[in-house]
Amino acid sequence: MAEEVSSLMKATVLMRQPGRVQEIVSALRRGGGDRLQVISDFDMTLSRFAYNGQRCPSSHNILDNSKIISEDCRKELTELFHHYYPIEIDPHRTIKEKLPHMVQWWSKAHSLLCQQRIQKFQIAQVVGESTAMLREGYKMFFDTLYHNNIPLFIFSAGIGDILEEIIRQMKVFHPNIHIVSNYMDFSEDGFLKGFKGQLIHTYNKNSSVCENSSYFQQLRNKTNIILLGDSIGDLTMADGVPGVQNILKIGFLNDKVEERRERYMDSYDIVLEKDETLDVVNGLLQHILRQGDCVELQGS
């Protein structure tokens, strides 16, 4: 008889190797909260991809769709999206082939935003007026990590100021959260003049842009990782972590499901297909922390 996590029985759950997943989950459970850290993407991973059939905005979209952006700028940003997004998710191109296109996309978009005379105080307002939503079950997720002293490292190619404000407005911005993202750089008179540090895009989310060796050094006893992402580029987010013993990779498959399913199942341990909740992640956390409901099942 094998003990399994009941949330893994959800219809949205796909696993190429259920036995392997069970081994990793058992190892995470043996380590408990003391050994665990979570590394996650933000846009369309912690935030929702869609609600009632409507696409939800990413942190970039929130700004693109806001009234502080001119109509011309919005049009140009939309054109960039329609040109580059198909390249980003094209299953027939290698990451190496996509890289220069992603750099061009982010650089052009950031350059357009810097021409808009965006002011720092407008960020909270723009987020408040947006339709951004965190996935169902977000409060339990953020609170469970915080109350069990489990660090949450958010590695995002979005806009740091925006996603931080979303988490704040949802009242779950706890002290255990560390964010690496594209943060806005404001002039002394409060206008956006650029972005700080190295550009982070979908396909360089790894130790090359991560000036966080000291962050991970402090957590060197946290040798077990749950990684959450929604793109193939998210799989490298834990590359800068020293001494990893066990890592469980969970991928949200939100878009172009049919053509990307096989690749996701080859790459992620657990794939969540069109699942707008954090139920599976929360169920796993409860299980690892020995708080969860388990069902007895025949071994996988």
From Swiss-Prot:
CMP binds at E88. It is found in: Cytoplasm. It comes from the Eukaryota. N(7)-methyl-GMP binds at E88. This is 7-methylguanosine phosphate-specific 5'-nucleotidase. GO terms for molecular function: hydrolase activity; magnesium ion binding; nucleotide binding. Pfam families: UMPH-1. InterPro entries: HAD-like_sf, HAD_sf, Pyrimidine_nucleotidase_eu. Substrate binds at S156, A157, K205. It is an enzyme of class 3 (hydrolase). SUPFAM superfamilies: HAD-like. Belongs to the pyrimidine 5'-nucleotidase family. NCBIfam families: HAD-SF-IE. It catalyses: N(7)-methyl-GMP + H2O = N(7)-methylguanosine + phosphate; CMP + H2O = cytidine + phosphate; a ribonucleoside 5'-phosphate + H2O = a ribonucleoside + phosphate. The active site is at D41 (nucleophile), D43 (proton donor). Monomer. Mg(2+) binds at D41, D43, D230. Its EC number is 3.1.3.91, 3.1.3.5. One of its GO terms (biological process) is nucleotide metabolic process. Keywords: Acetylation, Cytoplasm, Hydrolase, Magnesium, Metal-binding, Nucleotide metabolism, Nucleotide-binding. The modification N6-acetyllysine is found at K256. It comes from Rattus norvegicus (Rat). One of its GO terms (cellular component) is cytoplasm. PANTHER family: 5'-NUCLEOTIDASE (PTHR13045), 7-METHYLGUANOSINE PHOSPHATE-SPECIFIC 5'-NUCLEOTIDASE (PTHR13045:SF15). Specifically hydrolyzes 7-methylguanosine monophosphate (m(7)GMP) to 7-methylguanosine and inorganic phosphate. The specific activity for m(7)GMP may protect cells against undesired salvage of m(7)GMP and its incorporation into nucleic acids. Also has weak activity for CMP. UMP and purine nucleotides are poor substrates.
